Structure formats: C-alpha cells, structure tokens
Amino acid sequence: MLTNTAPAPDRDSASSALARERGGAQPLTVRDILGAPLAHKAGRPMARAVIRGLLLAFGRCIVQVRALERIAADRDPFILALNHSTKLEALFLPAFLLHARGGKPLHFIADWNFKLVPGIAAVYGAGDVIISDRKPARPRWLNVFRPLLTDRMPAFSRAAERLAAGASVGVFPEGTTNRDPRRLLRGFHGAARLSLQCGVPVVPAGIGFPRHGNTPRIRELAPMTIEFGEPLTPPSERNLSGSAVRAWHARVMCEIARLSGKVWSNENHRPV
C-alpha cells in the first residue's frame, strides 16, 4: 500500500503491469471488470461505464488470451492488425483492450455507418475510434447523414497523426466480417502501408474459435481465443512502392493466419 509520501504510479506503467499480469489471461470476472481503475479514463465516467457495460455483457465470450503484454501501454506506438469474424467483436474486443491497457486508447478504425445504430456513437466515443467513411450506408438515403458523422480527414491520415503522437492504432485488414472458420480474406493494404509510412511495428493478432466444430460459419458470440504475436518491425527504408506494400501486407496476413489457425492466400474470395 502506498503511503502519502510515495509518488503516484505512472498510469502507463500501471496499465502495462496489468497487461503483463494477464499475459495468459482467462475470462474476466465481474470483480475484474468493475474493480479495474481505468486510470486513463479518469474524468470520463460515461466512457468507463460503456467499457464496463460491454465487458459485463459480452466479456465471457473471450475464453483465453495469450501474450497480452505485447499490446501493453508502454509498447506504444504500434499498429494492431487482427482478423474479423463477427460483428459484435468489433464492439467488445476494443473494450477488452481498453480495460487491459488501463483505459488507454488503442484507436480502432471503424465504419461510420454503424453510428446510425442507437448507442454506437457512445461506444465509439468511449473507445476514441477513428471513423472511416469508405463504406456507404444501407438503405442509400441514410448516406445524407454521412457528413454529420464523419471526419473531414481520411481515416488513415488521422491514424498516421495518432501514431506520430505516440498512440497506437487497431485495424481489421480483412475490411469486413468474414465468418469462414478456415480462410482469411485477401484483405486491404492500409495497415501495411501505414506501418511502412510511419515506421512503426505491426502487432499481428489471431482470433480463434475453438468450439466452432465443423460448422461452415462462425456464429455471433461464439467463444473465442486471442493470441498476440511478436511485433513485426518494418524495413528501415520507407519504401512505399506497390511491391513493397504488397510484400509487407502478405507478411502481416500470414502471421494473422498462423495465430488464428486459418490460411491466407493472395487470391480474392467472397466473405462467408
């Protein structure tokens, strides 16, 4: 216990210690969720409530986490790149990472059109999400709201700005939900290009579904495991040629495939 004369613990050090302590984490308990101080969200009670609410509702879906220390707050800046298999994981997985990092944001790039769903704007605000306006809304008439719900700066330009400031960014390079339990999508090159442009490492991560059996599609809220890989450091020369970006993207996707137990190829196929 600290005495009155002891210096206050550094917030990054405290959240990093929490991540390391949970390096081989099992499911969060209610005590874990409600007891975490979330020091980086001090003064933001709504954000703390949203993070805890998401974890209370969905946190039990995460049954095992390996090498969580690789995304600790004192490892910033980096780009977290992981596969994307269900819609709801895009809400509760960032909440889990915020919790593990003491509330320090890991700025995920997310589609603007989900802000049309009641309550999602609050979730995006709690996670300090970077908004992408790439996808249109359905039905089309909802696109009239796009200027009100998006940033004038392109998402990856905003992400580069955050990285330059020492923050970390999260990307689902597949670009959409892919319920195929065996194959990754070819994916988009944005995360690879951002890594090469900014000279920051990519931390690959694989989400696995150990209980999906032989079903052809991964269902919502299926129990999942998460494994974080070793950081991939980009070449020192900032080569943004098409071939260099494609090669770096392939390396990242192959690591995600290995960690998630899926396969990846450069051939395009439709998401399941």
Q: In which residue ranges do the predicted regions lie?
A:
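Short hydrophobic helices that act as membrane-entry/anchoring signals
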Residues: 36, 40, 44-60, 121, ...
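Short, structurally constrained coil/turn elements
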Residues: 57-59, 74, 102, 165, ...
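Acidic/glycine-enriched edge-of-secondary-structure segments
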Residues: 47-56, 138-151
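Non-catalytic C-terminal accessory region of glycerolipid acyltransferases
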Residues: 2-34, 141-272
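Structural motif corresponding to alpha-helix initiation and N-cap regions
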Residues: 65, 117, 153-156
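Catalytic core of membrane glycerolipid acyltransferases/transacylases, capturing the structured
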Residues: 33-34, 74-148
